[in-house]
Amino acid sequence: MNEQEPAPKRGRRFKEQTPVQRALGLLVRREHSRKELNRKLLARGIEPDAAQAAVDRLTGEGWQDDARFAAAVVRNRAGSGYGPLHIRAELGTHGLDSEAISAAMATFQGDWTENARDLIHRRFGEQGPIDLPQRRKAADWLARRGFDGNSIRAATRFDLED
C-alpha cells in the first residue's frame, strides 16, 4: 500500500470573529442581559474594553435590550412554575436595577395565586393537600419556588383555624 499524505481540506477558512460577532452569536440563541453578555465575552478571552464596546454597540443598535431580556425571563420562569420572589431575585443577579425588575414583573399577565394553585393541583391532585402535614409540605414547596405568603395560603387553603 502506498502511504499518501491526506489531501488538504477544502472549504471555508474561518476568520477570527470580532467581539461584536461573538456577542451577536450569543444573542441569536437567546436574550442576554448586559452583565451576562459582558461576562460571557470575557470568559471567551475577549479584552474587557472590547467586550464592553461590543455590548454597548449591540445595545445601541437594538440587538441587546435589558427590558426585553427581563420580560423573557419573567415569562419563562412563571411558565416553569416559579413565583415572583424567585424571579425578582434571579433578575437581580443579572445586574438589573429595581425599576427594570418592577417593569418586567408588571408585564406578567397571569395571577400568581392561580399559578400556585395549578402547581399544587399538579403535585397533589385535584383535591389538593388534605391534612395539615400535606398542607405544610405544599406550603414549604411553594415557598422554595418563590411564592409569597398570600399566594401560598390561598393555594393550600390554609386557614388560621387549622
Swiss-Prot record:
GO terms for cellular component: cytoplasm. It comes from the Bacteria. Belongs to the RecX family. Transmembrane segments: none annotated. It is found in: Cytoplasm. This is Regulatory protein RecX. It comes from Xanthomonas oryzae pv. oryzae (strain KACC10331 / KXO85). Keywords: Cytoplasm. Modulates RecA activity. GO terms for biological process: regulation of DNA repair. Pfam families: RecX_HTH1 (PF21982), RecX_HTH2 (PF02631), RecX_HTH3 (PF21981). The lineage of its organism: Bacteria, Pseudomonadati, Pseudomonadota, Gammaproteobacteria, Lysobacterales.
